[in-house]
């Protein structure tokens, strides 16, 4: 295994040297990094490899990633296309700063029913935790308003609330090194303790 590993590393280093001269395949992330992928959520980079090392002309360098919530799944993302699809997971400091700003993050409110689901989709695909907070706040407010009117939460609202909440809590859980199930209470406790009278 070690021989194979060192051979793979040598190939990558050699190709990166050539690639850097050509301005392609710049490796931005490292093995062991936690990154956020739209819709999927947080993944750990397990390897950086060529899928076909024998074909230097047509082969691409890939990140091999495993979602933190499904380590059996493998995701391959081309290094050359990673900027638009990946970002580093929040640091612990960034996570606390986000929690601190939650009360001030504007609600992504829209009165256009036809555009609402599209807005939800865009927020989920944006790979931006603030966008997730914005639609979570919006859907929560809509739910409370509908309950006051004797109506149930819509299926679309319920689905995207669950998706957004899962993605947000997953990232905050990894950043804060806490179980995802504890994040909601962590947020509530922090905001309650830091309220300004």
Give residue spans per PLM region:
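Short, solvent-exposed secondary-structure boundary/capping segments
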Residues: 52-62
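Short beta-strand-centered aromatic/proline hotspots
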Residues: 41-51
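A short macromolecule-binding patch
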Residues: 64-66, 70-80
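Short, small-residue-biased leader/transition segments that mark boundaries at the very start
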Residues: 1-5
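Charge/polar-rich, low-complexity and marginally structured segments
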Residues: 80-197
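Short, positively charged and aromatic/hydrophobic N-terminal segments
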Residues: 7-23
């Amino acid at each position: 295994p070690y021989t194979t590993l060192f051979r793979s590393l040598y190939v990558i280093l050699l190709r990166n040297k050539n690639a850097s001269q050509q301005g392609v395949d710049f490796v931005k992330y490292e093995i062991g990094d936690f990154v956020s992928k739209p819709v999927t959520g947080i993944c750990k980079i397990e390897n950086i490899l060529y899928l076909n090392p024998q074909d230097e002309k047509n082969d691409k360098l890939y990140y091999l990633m495993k979602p933190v919530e499904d380590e059996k799944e493998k995701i391959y993302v081309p290094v050359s296309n990673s900027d638009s699809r990946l970002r580093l997971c929040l640091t612990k400091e960034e996570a606390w700063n986000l929690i601190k700003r939650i009360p001030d993050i504007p609600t992504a409110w829209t009165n256009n029913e036809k555009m609402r689901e599209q807005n939800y989709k865009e927020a989920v695909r944006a790979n931006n935790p603030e966008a997730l907070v914005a639609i979570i706040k919006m859907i929560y407010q809509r739910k409370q308003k509908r309950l006051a009117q004797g109506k149930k939460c819509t299926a679309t609202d319920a689905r995207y609330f669950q998706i957004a909440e899962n993605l947000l809590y997953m990232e905050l859980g990894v950043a804060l090194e806490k179980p995802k199930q504890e994040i909601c209470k962590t947020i509530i406790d922090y905001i309650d303790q830091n309220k300004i009278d």
